[in-house]
From Swiss-Prot:
Localization terms from the record: Golgi apparatus
Enzyme class: hydrolase
Keywords from the named record: ER-Golgi transport, Golgi apparatus, GTP-binding, Hydrolase, Lipoprotein, Myristate, Nucleotide-binding, Protein transport, Transport
Biological source species: Dictyostelium discoideum
EC number assigned by the record: 3.6.5.2
CDD domains attached to this UniProt entry: Arf1_5_like
Task performed by this protein: GTP-binding protein involved in protein trafficking; may modulate vesicle budding and uncoating within the Golgi apparatus.
Name recorded for this polypeptide: ADP-ribosylation factor 1
Protein family: Belongs to the small GTPase superfamily. Arf family.
Cysteines paired by S-S bonds: none
GO MF assignments: GTP binding; GTPase activity
Length: 182
């Protein structure tokens, strides 16, 4: 009886584990976001060759966040991280107008992958503190997000260095993932 009660208690009140894959073009701010969420501070980063993985606790959820390098030569490796991914965070440098189409192409490729068909999508529209940054509406349009009919998605304005918008994005992820797992 005690064991059954314990399982029931942890099911409703215990921590849930969620696997999150964070990708985007190189220099979009993925690693800065990961460590801002994990440590609450800005860390000096270098281009990620391979991946960083950290557990971020938020609202009774342990998010295991895989931050995978975004350079074009290593993007084919992204697929090795798709399995069991429940949430996808796609980070966009909203100040990089030259590569927004490239970002759209990479996102579209990923969303067509069968292994990610059930993953929810959170887009971090990063570097919103820069004066020439594209607005959330413009990035939404350029990524064709409104065409996503069969996927839950959300776009959040962020600034990785100040932390603005990061927890609002995690809030959406936690609410969406916990409501869909019931």
């Amino acid at each position: 009886m005690g064991l059954a009660f314990g399982k029931l208690f942890s099911r409703f009140f215990g921590k849930k584990d969620m696997r999150i894959l964070m990708v985007g073009l190189d220099a979009a701010g993925k690693t800065t976001i990961l460590y801002k969420l994990k440590l609450g501070e800005i860390v000096t980063t270098i281009p990620t060759i391979g991946f960083n993985v950290e557990t971020v606790e938020f609202k009774n959820i342990n998010f295991t966040v895989w931050d995978v390098g975004g350079q074009d030569k290593i993007r084919p490796l992204w697929r090795h991280y798709f399995q069991n991914t429940q949430g996808l965070i796609f980070v966009v440098d909203s100040n990089d107008r030259e590569r927004i189409q490239e970002a759209c192409d990479e996102l579209t490729k990923m969303l067509n992958e069968d292994e990610l068909r059930d993953a929810v999508l959170l887009v971090f529209c990063n570097k919103q503190d820069l004066p020439n940054a594209m607005s959330v509406a413009e990035v939404t349009d350029k990524l064709n997000l409104h065409s996503l009919r069969s996927r839950k998605w959300y776009i959040q304005s962020t600034c990785a260095t100040s932390g603005d918008g990061l927890y609002e994005g995690l809030d959406w992820l936690s609410n969406t993932l916990t409501s869909s797992s019931k």
